[in-house]
């Protein structure tokens, strides 16, 4: 690629998937530029590596670009896309650039509606512990490296495979993981769940004859597509059919202890401690163990990496104990969960990790279409918290949909009668609302995928200021 392409421009460079690819390209020696609507820690990091960044979108930002990479959120009428089209500069989706990177290494691609980021991070951490120095591109910040991407010297590249726009079908990995299949991003698939499942079948069928499909046998939709898969399959899960199986699962102090049974020619067992809470994370760890086993990683490296795993940014990220107004302390957690299934798993993990404590959930819905399609499920999962603070929907470029907004959710939760929700106009107001409400011993979870990402940090900052200054002085 490099003899023809020297300058790569990213439209929407601040997104987690885009920024990771940009960072790898910078480390490979390419000239990188990009634009986004707002400056953030990710764009500042890329600027530190030498990327030329622009706030906002304009045709002149293209400069001498040889190719333009766009995220699925970028529209056809974006001025940079229009200018690239007029100048006959190739315009490619993010996944196609990721596929180009994967061509020169052995690819491990992780797909699924939920759990992609954590599973990808666990695999990268295990391979790093084994001395295999992988390249990785992750949809969140891997705390151990402080980044969502890294160019390694090893032969493997570990990356998330995005089904939201079906672009994961561009990838050509040697190992493909499917964590689960759920009804999300249904606009892409014409609101036809069978089409969505068919895309996952095609994703797995793109494996070479020597490739391996690592799949969660516990997920009913994954199980349903297995008869259509002609490649080698490594099923994992809690069920007896799993060849990588967890048993004796116990939660303790925010960690999970379990026994792994691996059936791969011979049967072996070993005990694991995972430095994350929740059974859903155990499933993610089993996927990582399956991949590592396929690559002949020693069990010692697997055990050590899982026990020492430092987590991923905004995936049950713990901010520690935060001062409450009543003189005590509450536990603050930040999470990216934005689909009811993910939220339910996070709440269950919090109940296991902090039994008997009041659970306060501050949530920003993401996309009007998802809110509409999963409305009743959102009402149910939000009603399972003890206290609910809800903001308006983060549009992600979508037009508002009647009866699929934040206030409609609040009304429906109130009618359900299990909890009295509080509507907070904007995420910027959430930190103060949380501090007004949180009590000693509470567990406060800030959750969502939109503009809520800085709320937990701001809440902690304001609480620590208020601990030393009368609250009236900081209002």
Swiss-Prot record:
Main location: cytoplasm
One Pfam entry name: Mur_ligase_M
This protein's record includes keyword Transferase: no
Listed EC numbers: 6.3.2.8
Subcellular localization, as worded in the UniProt entry: Cytoplasm
Keyword check for Ligase: yes
Keywords attached to this entry: ATP-binding, Cell cycle, Cell division, Cell shape, Cell wall biogenesis/degradation, Cytoplasm, Ligase, Nucleotide-binding, Peptidoglycan synthesis
Annotated residues for binding of ATP: 112-118
GO cellular component: cytoplasm
SUPFAM superfamilies cross-referenced by the UniProt entry: MurCD N-terminal domain (SSF51984), MurD-like peptide ligases, catalytic domain (SSF53623), MurD-like peptide ligases, peptide-binding domain (SSF53244)
GO terms for biological process, alphabetical: cell division; cell wall organization; peptidoglycan biosynthetic process; regulation of cell shape
Gene3D superfamilies named in the record: Mur ligase, C-terminal domain, Mur-like, catalytic domain, NAD(P)-binding Rossmann-like Domain
A single GO molecular function term of this UniProt record: UDP-N-acetylmuramate-L-alanine ligase activity
Family: Belongs to the MurCDEF family.
Record's function text: Cell wall formation.
Annotated protein name in UniProt: UDP-N-acetylmuramate--L-alanine ligase
UniProt organism field: Methylobacillus flagellatus (strain ATCC 51484 / DSM 6875 / VKM B-1610 / KT)
């Amino acid at each position: 690629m490099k003899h023809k392409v020297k300058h790569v421009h990213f439209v929407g460079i601040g997104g987690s998937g885009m920024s990771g690819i940009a960072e790898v390209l910078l480390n490979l020696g390419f000239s990188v530029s990009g634009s986004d609507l707002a400056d953030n820690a990710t764009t500042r990091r890329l600027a530190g590596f030498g990327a030329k960044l622009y706030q906002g979108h304009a045709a002149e930002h293209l400069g001498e670009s040889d190719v333009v990479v766009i995220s699925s959120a970028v529209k056809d009428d974006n001025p940079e896309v229009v200018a690239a089209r007029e100048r006959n500069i190739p315009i490619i989706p993010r996944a196609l650039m990721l596929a180009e990177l994967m061509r020169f290494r052995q690819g491990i691609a992780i797909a699924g509606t939920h759990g992609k980021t954590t599973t990808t991070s666990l695999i990268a951490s295990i391979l790093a512990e084994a001395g295999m120095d992988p390249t990785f591109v992750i949809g969140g910040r891997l705390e151990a490296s402080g980044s969502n991407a890294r160019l390694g010297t090893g032969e493997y590249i570990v990356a998330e495979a995005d089904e939201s726009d079906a672009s994961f079908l561009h990838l050509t990995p040697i190992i493909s993981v499917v964590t689960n299949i759920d009804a999300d991003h249904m606009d892409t698939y014409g609101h036809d769940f069978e089409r969505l499942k068919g895309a996952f079948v095609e994703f797995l069928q793109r494996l070479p004859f020597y490739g391996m499909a690592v799949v969660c046998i516990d997920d009913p939709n994954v199980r349903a597509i297995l008869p259509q898969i002609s490649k080698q399959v490594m099923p994992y899960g809690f069920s007896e059919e799993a060849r990588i199986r967890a048993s004796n699962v116990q939660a303790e102090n925010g960690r999970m202890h379990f026994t792994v049974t691996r059936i791969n020619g011979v049967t072996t067992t070993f005990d694991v401690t995972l430095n994350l809470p929740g059974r859903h994370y155990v499933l993610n760890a089993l996927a990582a163990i399956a991949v590592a086993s396929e690559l002949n990683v020693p069990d010692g490296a697997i055990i050590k990496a899982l026990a020492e795993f430092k987590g991923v940014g905004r995936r049950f990220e713990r901010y520690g104990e935060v001062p409450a107004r009543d003189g005590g302390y509450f536990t603050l957690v930040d999470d990216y969960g934005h689909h009811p299934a993910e939220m339910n798993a996070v709440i269950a993990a919090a109940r296991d990790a902090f039994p008997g404590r009041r659970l306060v959930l501050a949530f920003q819905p993401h996309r009007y279409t998802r809110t509409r399609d999963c409305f009743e499920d959102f009402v149910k999962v939000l009603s399972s918290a003890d206290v609910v603070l809800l903001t308006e929907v983060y549009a992600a470029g979508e037009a508002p949909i009647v009866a699929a907004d934040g206030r409609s959710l609040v009304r429906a939760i109130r009618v359900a009668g299990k909890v009295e929700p509080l509507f907070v106009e904007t995420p910027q107001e959430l930190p103060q609302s949380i501090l007004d409400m949180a009590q000693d011993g509470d567990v406060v979870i800030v959750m969502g995928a939109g503009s809520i990402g800085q709320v937990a940090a701001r809440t902690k900052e304001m609480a620590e200021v208020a601990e030393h200054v009368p609250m009236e002085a900081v209002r």
